C-alpha cells in the first residue's frame, strides 16, 4: 500500500501489515490500560495502629479519673494514632508481551490511516528554536492538535513546540499508544515511517 506525502507530489510504499491491518479494539484497549497502569506510582502508604511508633502503656488507670477509658494512645480515635484500614503501597503494573504491544501500535497506525489522521511529509523541522516559526508552519498545514514524530530527537523542534498547546514532539523510540490516540493528527516524516516499520517488524 502507499501513503501520499503531503509536501511532495509522490507516495511512500509501506507494509500493509503495519499500516493496513484491521483495528483490534480489545487489544488496543488492553495495551492502553496497561500503559496507564504502569505509569502509576503506587507509593501511597499509611500506618495502622500496630505500626505507629509509641508506648504500649495504658495512658491512665481504668477507673476513678472521670475520663473515658483508654488502653492505648495509638488507636484510630486518637490524634497521631494509626489509621483504620490503612492504605498500603501497591504495584499496579500489568504485563504486556512485545507481540501484543507491537500489534496494538500497528492497529493504531492502521486506524489513523483509515481516519485520515496520519499526515506523512518528506521532512519537517525549524531552523531555530522559535515557537512563532513552528506555529506558522503548522497553521500553513492546518494542523493544531498534533503529535510530531521525527526519526531522532530534534532539539530545535522540541524547544519550539514546548510552549504550544496540544502540540508534542517525539522521536520514533519515544512514541506510545496513549500519545498516538490522544492527538487529533499525527505528523510523521518519511524517514520516521521507515523506522516505525523496522521497529514493528
Curated annotation (Swiss-Prot):
GO MF annotations, alphabetized: rRNA binding; structural constituent of ribosome
Region of interest: Disordered: 46-71
Pfam family, one: Ribosomal_L4
SUPFAM superfamilies: Ribosomal protein L4
Superkingdom field: Bacteria
Disulfide cysteine pairs (residue numbers): none
BP terms from Gene Ontology: translation
Keyword terms, alphabetized: Ribonucleoprotein, Ribosomal protein, RNA-binding, rRNA-binding
GO CC terms of this entry: ribonucleoprotein complex; ribosome
Subunit structure: Part of the 50S ribosomal subunit.
Family: Belongs to the universal ribosomal protein uL4 family.
Function: One of the primary rRNA binding proteins, this protein initially binds near the 5'-end of the 23S rRNA. It is important during the early stages of 50S assembly. It makes multiple contacts with different domains of the 23S rRNA in the assembled 50S subunit and ribosome. Forms part of the polypeptide exit tunnel.
Protein name: Large ribosomal subunit protein uL4
Source species taxonomy: Bacteria, Pseudomonadati, Pseudomonadota, Gammaproteobacteria, Alteromonadales
Name of the encoding gene: rplD
